[in-house]
Every structure is written in structure tokens, then in C-alpha cells.
Amino acid sequence: MAKTSSVEKNNRRRKLADQYGPKRAALKAIIMDQSKPMEERFRAQLKLAALPRNSAKIRIRNRCEVTGRPRAYYRKLKVSRIALRDLGNNGQIPGLVKSSW
């Protein structure tokens, strides 16, 4: 089980990214638009830099929904390999069958 503080920190980052996502996208569009004057693009860049650092999507870490483990994460199921094995052995994931040959 991961530390509760690191899981909560990641959840706060997710909320900030959702909150500031449209504003960040609008500012980035202004910055990348070559037809805009340089001063306007520079002001947009300063506004983007003034936003909270944790509002960037890149700072979000994929974590297991069951254990909070940050590594060996299966995106499709949102669980780690260890939780996947436990849930699969208990028959809680539909369609997952233990292999035998």
C-alpha cells in the first residue's frame, strides 16, 4: 500500500489539472499562434508561468486504484500488476482466465 499522502497529493494534482485545463489550453494556443504579435504571445507565456505548477497534466502520476502503487500500472484496468493478479485469482475481473497449456 502506498503512502496516503502521496496518493492524496496526486488526487490534488488531478483536481488542479481539471480546473485549469481549459485556461492552460487557451494560453498555449495563443503562444503557438505565429500570427499573433510577439508581445501578446509573451504576455500569454507569463500568464501560463504564473499558473500553479501542479495544474499541468504532465505532473499527474498513474496510480493503482486499489493499492495506490505507482509502478507496473495497467491503464485499461487502472490497477497494478499485483492487484491485477489478486483480483484475477479471486474472479473479480470478468473474462480474465488463468492460463494453462
From Swiss-Prot:
Region listing for Disordered, in residue ranges: 1-21
Gene3D superfamilies registered for this protein in UniProt: 1.10.287.1480
Pfam families reported in the protein's UniProt record: Ribosomal_S14
UniProt superkingdom: Bacteria
Gene Ontology biological process terms from the UniProt entry: translation
Disulfide-bond pairs as recorded: none
GO molecular function: rRNA binding; structural constituent of ribosome
Keywords per UniProt: Ribonucleoprotein, Ribosomal protein, RNA-binding, rRNA-binding
GO cellular component, one term: small ribosomal subunit
Family label: Belongs to the universal ribosomal protein uS14 family.
Chain's role: Binds 16S rRNA, required for the assembly of 30S particles and may also be responsible for determining the conformation of the 16S rRNA at the A site.
HAMAP family documented for this protein: Ribosomal_uS14_1
Assembly information from the UniProt record: Part of the 30S ribosomal subunit. Contacts proteins S3 and S10.
Protein name as annotated: Small ribosomal subunit protein uS14
Species of origin: Mesorhizobium japonicum (strain LMG 29417 / CECT 9101 / MAFF 303099) (Mesorhizobium loti (strain MAFF 303099))
GN (gene name): rpsN
